[in-house]
Amino acid sequence: MALGKRKRERQLDAFVASSDLPQSPGHPFYTALNRLLAENDFDSFVEELCAPYYASSMGRPSIPPGVFLRMTFVGYFEGLDSHRSIAWRCADSRSLAEFLGLGPADPTPDHSSISKTHKRLPKEVFEQVFQFILRVAARKGLLSGKKIGIDSTTVQANASMKSIVRKDSGKGWKDYTKKLAKEAGLDAPTAAELQQFDRKRKGKKVSNDEWENPHDPDATVTRMKNGTTRLAYKAEHAVDLESDLIVSATMHTGIAADTETVIDTAVDAAVNLEAAGSEDEVKTVVADKGYHSNKVMTLAEELNFETVIPERDTPTNRRWSDKEPATKRAVYNNRRRTKSERGKKLSRLRSELVERSFAHVCDTGGGRRTWHRGIVNVTKRHLMLVASRNLSTIMRMLCGIGSPRTLQGLRGLLQTAWIHIQSHVQPLKIDMPQWGGHIWIAVTDLRLTWSASW
């Protein structure tokens, strides 16, 4: 074999036959995912859903809704947190272009087009897409929803603390600090002196009643999990404790109290389950002690929700003389369920599954920080991340693989074989460059055969 040399200068071809264009064998995971979406007529559903928000005849054709939504799925599966990085990744991969339904000569959508499409479509479209994915799970018999676990986490906003201004005067933090320094006797302080004064002054507090970010007024000053103070939102998940599917994902301001949002999230989960065609209704709501209050216990019982929520530690015994009998009954019923063996088991299961959903969506899925502004746009992006995570869970339950990054090493080889066993596809050739050869995997009468050549 002769040595091939890379051409330093290359003259572009004027004409290229379509048969000479680069072809991709496709990625096994994305191929299986496309098959699942096609089985449920995903493209027809989203095209009909998005049609009212586009002109019926005039104008340049937009990104097909099915392509746009698949690109948001790619963002989750590849751990990409911005439209620019998603567009670059799709343009760089032939297997992803095939997943999007683009031919070898078709350009991938630009990141600006993705952003404009995201802004054009209302939140209701993203909510119905989220419900569609749940409906896919229900058709496969994977969705229950009788017992849900609820918890929340912070999502860092696309806004800086350095840009906050006072609501009454519109002055920034620096001007406000200069005013305080002048009142304290420091005339014309330098930047270093002003920074030192601000760091040492007592009673320093940033209240959301007095301060806001002009670029994203919906973001609030929030204490993050790591102890820092940032402008952020609060994402709340309700997870089906039997299937590990997220049945509700709501977004709130960073300072929204857990006790004020838990019932709304539980009701939203019930609505989504009904829209998905689930035969079961939400019966048990499991949460941590941060969600416990008399109001929550009473309202949950009125809505026929059984709560398993531990009580906060109190230094004194509770008094019931000034409370309604229904409130006392609801609190005691919750206490009995929480202390039972079943309640303890559900609490442990909630901690495992809900925290796992945050790890997948926010940490590995790129959702810990948002590049959108405004609670509506942030909600739309988070709904797509959660819908992608549900797709991942469905794929894992159907064929054992929930992520394209799972297909690595020997385990990935065996899981790839399982995908082809399930779908009865043609023999699959897997190149093994590190071994200097390839492996053929074939399915004949439900019997797996493989051979290697070097």
Residues of each region from the PLM?
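Short, flexible loop/hinge motifs at secondary-structure junctions
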Residues: 1-23, 180, 407
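Trp/Phe/Arg-rich N-terminal binding region typifying the photolyase-homology
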Residues: 3-4, 53-67, 74, 78-119
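Hydrophobic alpha-helical scaffolding
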Residues: 19, 23, 32, 119, ...
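Basic, short loop/linker segments at the boundary and entry of helix-turn-helix/winged-helix-like folds
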Residues: 23-73, 78
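A short glycine/serine-rich beta->alpha loop
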Residues: 54-61, 251, 372-375
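Polybasic low-complexity intrinsically disordered regions
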Residues: 64, 88-91, 101-102, 107-305, ...
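Basic, amphipathic alpha-helical segments enriched in Lys/Arg and hydrophobic/aromatic residues
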Residues: 259, 343-436, 440, 448-454
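Helix-centered, glycine/charged polyanion-binding patches within enzymatic domains
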Residues: 290-376, 402
